[in-house]
Curated annotation (Swiss-Prot):
Region (Interaction with the F-box domain of F-box proteins): 108-167
Organism in which the protein naturally occurs: Arabidopsis thaliana (Mouse-ear cress)
Main localization, broad class: nucleus
Residue span of region Disordered: 216-240, 330-351
Positions with biased composition (Polar residues): 330-342
Subcellular location(s) per record: Nucleus
Gene that this polypeptide is encoded by: ASK21
Summary of subunit composition and partner proteins: Part of a SCF (SKP1-cullin-F-box) protein ligase complex.
Entry protein name: SKP1-like protein 21
Stored Pfam families: Skp1
Length: 351
């Protein structure tokens, strides 16, 4: 405190003790000469007139706790005594700041709150020597600071108000690292796009449930292959059955054709008929060419017609029992030109 400020203080305000209240609510009584060494306390006494009694104690800032206040007053007691040499003060200061980093930081903060600049400078120089030559990671480890800065924030350019060449070089290095960081981020984004998860919902559910999607796919493919084989076997079986039916029909047709051929030959041998036609069972008044053979005796012709009809009737009844309803009755006809034809049901159009 300067001599001018000391002269302003009235005699009645000069007390032997000043009452101070810390942030935790505790009240301390400190010598006036020691307390007035702190500019903040001196201003409170002069401007507000507080600190003269316990009921009007001076409220100290939040960062000043009782332990730090005791250290600050020890420093003030030593330095407020006149007549000490600079060497003595320097030795005392070196011993005074021998403490751990945490307490040194708290002391710096408390001295700054009380506006005690000599002590702030002393503790700040001590902190500067501690962090000198350390990397940001080491500094955070020393002061137990969390690494809450992103890579881009760490590489932001520094302000170079004094045009320091070292800061210029450092900013160039930061710019290069920022460029490399952006390139790495681009590569990562490309890799993420390439490795897009294309699994189906079933595979994802299987993965969540702890099953192997490959096993599920294998079982599904086996089921599909089994179904395909069953369908192929069913279609082949159906094809074979259809072929067997067709072959059976062809056999029955060929047998029927042989029967008809044999019947026709037998009929020709037994009756010695000169000819046969398919339209024998058409009405007697209708003939294919409208021709009537006048050389055949009508009585003999009538007898032959009856024999042919009777034979055809018996032949038809035997065919129904042998091949069912697949064939129509075989009709024989004899026309006047001495030729004969046979009809075999649906194949009547073939001669």
């Amino acid at each position: 405190m300067s001599e001018g400020e000391m002269a302003i203080i009235k005699p009645e305000m000069m007390k032997s003790y000043i009452w101070l209240e810390t942030a935790d609510g505790s009240i301390q009584q400190v010598e006036q000469e020691v307390a007035m060494f702190c500019p903040m306390i001196c201003q409170e006494v002069i401007q507000k007139g507080v600190g003269s009694s316990k009921n009007y104690a001076i409220s100290l800032p939040q960062r000043v706790n009782p332990a730090m206040l005791s250290l600050i007053f020890d420093y003030c007691r030593f330095h407020q005594v006149p007549g000490r040499s600079n060497k003595e003060r320097k030795v005392y200061d070196e011993k005074f700041i021998r403490m751990d980093t945490k307490r040194l930081c708290e002391l710096t903060s408390a001295a700054d709150s009380l506006q005690l600049k000599p002590l702030v400078d002393l503790t700040s120089r001590a902190l500067a020597r501690i962090i000198e030559g350390k990397t940001p990671e080491e500094i955070r480890e020393i002061f137990h600071l969390p690494d809450d800065l992103t890579e881009e924030e760490k590489l932001e350019p520094l302000k170079n108000t004094m045009d320091d060449p070292r800061i210029r070089l450092l900013n160039r290095l930061y710019a290069k690292k920022r460029k490399e960081l952006k390139e790495r981020e681009k590569l990562k984004s490309v890799e993420v796009e390439e490795h897009v998860d294309e699994r189906s919902v079933d595979d994802l559910l299987s993965f969540i449930n702890g099953r192997d999607p490959k096993v599920v796919k294998t079982s599904k493919s086996k089921k599909k292959n089994k179904k395909r084989k069953e369908q192929k076997n069913g279609s082949s079986n159906g094809t074979c059955e259809a072929l067997e039916k067709d072959l059976h029909n062809l056999d029955s047709k060929s047998q029927s054709a042989e029967i008809v051929d044999n019947t026709a030959s037998c009929l020709g041998d037994v009756s010695n008929l000169p000819s046969m036609e398919d339209d024998i069972f058409t009405p007697k008044t209708e003939f294919e060419d409208g021709y009537i053979d006048d050389e055949i005796d009508p009585a003999l012709k009538e007898l032959l017609d009856r024999e042919v009809e009777d034979f055809a009737r018996r032949l038809n009844s035997s065919w129904v029992l042998s091949i069912g309803q697949e064939r129509q009755p075989v009709n024989f006809s004899i026309n006047g030109n001495g030729t004969s034809r046979r009809l075999t049901g649906p194949a009547a159009g073939h001669k």
